[in-house]
Amino acid sequence: SLPNGPRNRVWNTGSGKAEFTIHPIPHIELADDQYLMATVRSHDQYNTTIYGLDDRYRGIYGERRVVMMNPQDIADAGFTEGQIVDLTSHFEDGERHAPRFVIVRQDVPRRCVFTYFPEANPLVPARSVARLSNTPTSKSVVISMRPAE
């Protein structure tokens, strides 16, 4: 088998032990009608290659244009499960829009929503990137939603 330091409990660090770095999570102010969106993969997906429309991890079948929401957030916003909504992201350089996402009830943290990528990629601001890696901040996008037109 290939060498695997952690599996063999070998840590190539100055201390000879596993070392962890802790990064504080920035506080993001959300307006009353805003949520923090993270994009995720489905079970039938490898990176951006999509093999099917089913996500057995989350019990979602036959659809990928979904916004997964906390049940209490759905009720508080006056939405219903299965309702079709348009999503808008908000960043310093303007707004981006992605139409016709289906609300799906999931056990996610309050004021946070999950969407699949690449379907929600248009909402991710190209200029919003991680400081060191320069990768898009796809796990931290401020959005709002309204009933679909």
Regions found by a protein language model. Name each.
Residues 48, 53-149:
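Long, contiguous, secondary-structure-rich segments that constitute the structural scaffold
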